[in-house]
Design a protein with these regions (language model features):
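PLP-dependent aminotransferase class I/II
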Residues: 200-279, 284-287
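PLP-dependent enzyme catalytic core of the Aspartate aminotransferase-like
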Residues: 163, 312, 316-345
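Active-site phosphate-binding strand-loop segment of PLP-dependent enzymes
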Residues: 125, 129-185
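Short beta->alpha connector loops at strand-helix junctions that form conserved
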Residues: 107, 126-130, 205, 320-321
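Phosphate-binding glycine-rich loop
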Residues: 62-102
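Conserved PLP-anchoring active-site segment centered on the Schiff-base-forming lysine
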Residues: 95-116
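Conserved PLP-binding catalytic core of the aspartate aminotransferase-like
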Residues: 269, 281-313
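N-terminal "arm"/small-domain region of PLP-dependent enzymes with the aminotransferase-like
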Residues: 1-55, 143
Length: 345
C-alpha cells in the first residue's frame, strides 16, 4: 500500500448536512435561518461593477473586517475572516494546536473537531459532558495544548455562562482557548467582552446562522493582534484570496444592518420558545436550548424510526451518531407542519 493511501485510510471525514431539493419539504437538518438576509445584501452585491470581477479580491478583506471590528468595538487587527467558520476553525487548529500535549473538546460537540485533529496529527481528548449534557469547566483544568468548545454547544444547545468561560481561561493561561460561537446570537452571552482580559482567547463566529448568509460562506474570529498576525501568516501560506468580492460586499452589508439583524433574531427566538412549548405538550424532552435548534428525545419513540418517518414526509432532520437526535427548526409555518406530523405518529 502506498503511503498516501494509508494516510487517506486514516482520515474520517466530516459528513455535511444533506441539501435535498424538493418543492414541498421542511428542511431542518443544517440550522439555516428561515428568513432571508438583509435587503442591503442584495443592493451591495448589485453595486459591484461587473468589470471588477476580472480582478482578484482584497486578500485582507479590509472592508468586511473593518465592519466587524466596528460592530464589536475592536480594532481591525483583531479580526480575521475566512470562507465560513469551518475554514477559520481549520486554520486555527493548524496554526495553534501543534504541541505534544492533547487539545481538549467535549465528546458530544461539533463533529469537525476530531476530524481536523486527526487530519493534522493533533493529539486530543474528548471530554465527557455531565449527565445533564453540560460542559463542566473543571474538567478542562488539566494539562493541554489548547481548548475548543462551542457556546452554545452543538448539538445540545446548552450555553455556558460567561463566568464559566472566564474560569476555563484563568486555569489555562498558557493555552489558546477557542470559543466557537456559531449560535451565540440566539441567546447565549458572547465571550467577546473577555478579549481585553485574556490574550489567549479567540472567539469564532459565522454569518451562516443568525445573519442568514450560509450560501455566501463567511466566518470570522476575533482575538489579540499577535494571534491574528500568526493566523494571517498561515493563511497566506495556503491561499491569499479566500473571500471573493461578492462575499465581502454581502458580509459587510449584513454586518452593518443592525436593525434588521435584531428584528429577525427576535422572531427566531420567539419561534424557538413556542416550539419548546409545543414539543413538551407532545411529551418530548430536551435541554434548554439557547441556539436555533433543539436536541430532543421521547420516552415512547425510537429516534431512528422517527428520523425515517419524518424523512418519508419530506421533513429533513440531522441523523447523528449520538442519541437523541437534534431537531433544528425553521419558520412558524414549517413548525406547524412538523408538529402535525409528530401528532400523527
Amino acid at each position: 500500500m502506498k503511503a498516501y493511501q494509508q494516510y487517506i485510510r486514516n482520515v474520517d471525514p466530516y459528513v455535511p448536512g444533506e441539501q435535498p431539493h424538493f418543492d414541498q419539504m421542511v428542511k431542518l437538518n443544517t440550522n439555516e435561518n428561515p428568513y432571508p438576509p438583509s435587503p442591503n445584501v442584495l443592493q451591495a452585491i448589485a453595486a459591484i461593477p461587473l468589470q471588477e470581477q476580472r480582478l482578484y479580491p482584497d486578500p485582507t478583506a479590509h472592508q468586511l473586517n473593518a465592519a466587524i471590528a466596528k460592530r464589536y468595538g475592536l480594532q481591525e487587527d483583531q479580526v480575521f475572516s475566512g470562507v465560513g467558520s469551518d475554514d477559520v476553525l481549520a486554520m486555527l487548529f493548524l496554526t495553534f494546536f501543534n504541541g505534544t500535549k492533547p487539545i481538549l473538546f467535549p465528546d458530544i460537540s461539533y463533529a469537525f473537531y476530531p476530524v481536523w485533529a486527526k487530519l493534522f496529527g493533533i493529539p486530543y481528548e474528548a471530554i465527557p459532558l455531565d449527565e445533564q449534557l453540560r460542559i463542566v469547566p473543571e474538567d478542562y483544568y488539566r494539562p493541554n495544548n489548547g481548548i475548543v468548545f462551542p457556546n452554545p454547544n452543538a448539538p445540545t444547545g446548552i450555553a455556558l455562562p460567561l463566568d464559566a468561560i472566564r474560569s476555563i481561561l484563568e486555569h489555562n493561561p498558557d493555552s489558546i482557548v477557542l470559543v466557537d460561537e456559531a449560535y451565540v446570537d440566539f441567546g447565549a452571552e458572547s465571550a467577546v467582552s473577555l478579549l481585553p482580559e485574556f490574550e489567549n482567547l479567540i472567539v469564532v463566529q459565522t454569518f451562516s446562522k443568525s445573519r442568514a448568509l450560509a450560501g455566501s460562506r463567511i466566518g470570522f474570529c476575533m482575538g489579540a493582534p499577535e494571534l491574528i498576525r500568526a493566523l494571517n501568516n498561515v493563511k497566506y501560506s495556503f491561499n491569499s484570496y479566500t473571500l471573493n468580492r461578492t462575499a465581502i460586499a454581502a458580509g459587510t452589508a449584513a454586518m452593518e444592518d443592525e436593525d434588521y439583524f435584531q428584528r429577525h433574531l427576535k422572531l427566531v427566538v420567539e419561534t424557538r420558545e413556542w416550539t419548546k412549548q409545543q414539543l413538551a405538550q407532545l411529551g418530548f424532552q430536551f435541554p434548554d436550548s439557547k441556539s436555533n435548534f433543539l436536541f430532543v428525545t421521547h420516552p415512547d419513540y425510537d429516534m431512528c424510526q422517527l428520523f425515517t418517518y419524518l424523512r418519508s414526509k419530506q421533513i429533513f432532520v440531522r441523523q447523528q451518531k449520538w442519541k437523541p437526535y437534534w431537531l433544528p427548526f425553521g419558520n412558524f409555518c414549517k413548525q406547524n407542519t412538523r408538529l402535525d406530523s409528530k401528532e400523527k405518529i
